Amino acid sequence: TVLSPLTAFADAEEQELNIAIFQGGYGDAYWNQMVELFEESHEGVKVNMTISPTIGDIIRPQIVAGNVPDFICLNDGGEDGVILSLIKEHALLNLNDVFDGENYAGTGTLRDDITDGILASSKCAPYGDGDIYLAPFNSGPQGLIYNKTFFDENNLEVPKTWDEFFALGDKVKDIDGRALFTYQGIYPGYMEEMLWPAIANECGEEALTKIANYEEGSFNNEGVLKALSHIKEIADKGYLLEGTVGMNHTESQTEMMLGKAAFITNGTWMENEMQDAPREDGFEFAMAPIPTENADDVH
């Protein structure tokens, strides 16, 4: 999520803009290009960018000391908790004017370019009043990454249901001993890519809204508990790659690419992030949706 306490700098003179950026799997090249273009189009403004995979830990003491960056790009679900703290403290600037302003192409407002429902969600409008305080900084699918070559060579079908998912775990173990699943261990936030779709499938988007709003009892209902039971079954029945919980993101992703596990949760950035990582022969990235209860359920 991106949050920004900035307005237009068209008339700025000799001003400095301090920005703090999370460096994820997409790399830093596009951020460097944006900084260059911004400085070219805003004469007199110098952009000081701090970019790091651990940017939350870097800026937390600065924020506590009252030295808050002008612009922050950081995952709202990060283990550092920075974004959640800023939301709780009502420390974010209202961004309605940004999205009601003209889009880059000059064909309408920026709001018109955003997929319906995103800006109204609790991710962007955390106080439920319709006002936007956080903005999405990228858009792309997330799901189960797997090696298409391995599936094709062994005539394996991508599982659509949870029953098929666990049955596949038995098949791949028999083929070459690989586990069904791994995840980014010490960064369990990646598991939300499996958790939230599973809950939405069981009991709808309303359940996610209740959870996001910390409503009492939001987890204690049959549908949510059923979704959680599927994820628990991965560990309880031996489908999780041994050692997963102690790995970081690149370690677990490498293990999966080496053929130690059939699936890992991730997004489209993994291909770029792991471009130089070792892998099993013929490895080809592919992505599948999270399993559903029934094969004809809508994702």
Label each residue range with its predicted role.
Residues 13-24, 45-50, 71, 133:
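Short, well-ordered beta-strand elements
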Residues 121-137, 142, 166-216, 261:
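Extracytoplasmic/periplasmic solute-binding protein
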Residues 83-85, 194, 201-203, 229-299:
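Extracytoplasmic/periplasmic substrate-binding proteins
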Residues 80-141, 194, 286-288:
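Hinge/lid segment of periplasmic solute-binding proteins
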Residues 25-46:
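Short, polar/charged alpha-helical segment
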Residues 62, 94-114, 201-226, 276-279, ...:
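Short, solvent-exposed loop/beta-turn-alpha elements that line the ligand-binding surface or hinge
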Residues 169-171, 213-245:
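Glycine-centered hinge/linker elements that transmit conformational signals in sensory
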Residues 1-18, 40:
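Short, low-complexity disordered leader/linker segments with a strong preference
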